[in-house]
Amino acid sequence: MLHHMRTIINASWRYGNKCIVRQFGFSQTYSQLKGRDLLTLKNYSAEEIKYLLWVAADLKYRIKEKGEYLPLLQGKSLAMIFEKRSTRTRLSTETGFALLGGHPSFLTTQDIHLGVNESLKDTARVLSGMTDAVLARVYHQSDLEVLAEEASIPIVNGLSDDYHPIQILADYLTIQEHYGHLKGLTISWIGDGNNVLHSIMMSAAKFGMHLHIATPKGYEPNSSLTEAAKQFSKECGTKLLMTNDPLEAANGANVLVTDTWVSMGQEEEKKKRLLDFKGYQITMKTAKLAAPNWIFLHCLPRKPEEVDDEVFYCPKSLVFQEAENRKWTIMGVMVSLLTDYSPQLLRPTF
């Protein structure tokens, strides 16, 4: 990975009807990410994550607002390997990659059985000779790690049982668009200690964001990742609250977030989980404890037991803006990992 310095002048970033004013400064450092894998945000620095979001915001502005045609991925091909079903990840990746002039190829478990008909090692080497990148949606994080070790092209995590990094990038872009910054905000996660939460835990503190986590007993996030999150919080001077009380977690939060209580592969546990998560539904009672300017996010698909209609469909719910931003952030990731692109939009405030 190459690193270099880029001098820019921070001024105001106008997007739509918003004008985000920033302080003037010079010698902003960012990482050139071409050729990198994106398996987790744990090993991405704050500046690297911010750069991915910057590119996403730039592409959204230039393509959606200005109507530019940017064939940045012309001649590039992407292998999409999906062991798990998907709506938003598949659609955002296929449409986004094609919009930039690239060619995505979708492979299901009927087309490719990772590590079954062919070893992961061999699959990685075959894909490296035929495509420019791989986005894989798998059960086991270890499969992604083997692919990344053996492949000579970027491997992107489209979701695993451990992490969902591209979802969290969309969340951060949505929050930034709404508030104009991320630093100092408090995210409240109320629900299961799952892969989406793990990705928040590995990145929120790097933006200077505080994190409140409420899970039922027995559904806490991974213990080793909890320790890593505590260390990130300590290094970044942020607050990390972990509790079994959803109302305590909601107190003072700027962003209320939840997700499915029954992830893919856990269908047999549904009846037990619905009982164990009783009291964790996000309602206006929950929201009344949050900051006055709270917003609500959910990666979708949503079930009514997770959040009621009053919150889900209210003006403070940004779930559909969040869903759209899945496209722009995956486009930002692909452009960053496959090209030498430099954003034209002035760097947003984070």
Curated annotation (Swiss-Prot):
Pfam families reported for this sequence: OTCace, OTCace_N
Gene Ontology annotations for the cellular component aspect, listed alphabetically: mitochondrial matrix
Annotated InterPro entries: Asp/Orn_carbamoyltranf_P-bd, Asp/Orn_carbamoylTrfase, Asp/Orn_carbamoylTrfase_sf, Asp_carbamoyltransf_Asp/Orn-bd, Orn/put_carbamltrans
Claim: Transferase is one of the keywords in the record: yes
Induction of the gene: By thyroid hormone.
Origin superkingdom: Eukaryota
A biological process term (GO) from this entry: citrulline biosynthetic process
Transit peptide, UniProt annotation: 1-30
Membrane spanning stretches: none
Locations listed in the record: Mitochondrion matrix
EC number: 2.1.3.3
Catalyzed chemical reaction(s): carbamoyl phosphate + L-ornithine = L-citrulline + phosphate + H(+)
Entry-linked PANTHER family: ORNITHINE CARBAMOYLTRANSFERASE, MITOCHONDRIAL, ORNITHINE TRANSCARBAMYLASE, MITOCHONDRIAL
Function: OTC is necessary for the tadpoles transition from an ammonotelic, aquatic larva to a ureotelic, terrestrial adult.
Subunit structure: Homotrimer.
Family to which the UniProt record says this protein belongs: Belongs to the aspartate/ornithine carbamoyltransferase superfamily. OTCase family.
Protein name: Ornithine carbamoyltransferase, mitochondrial
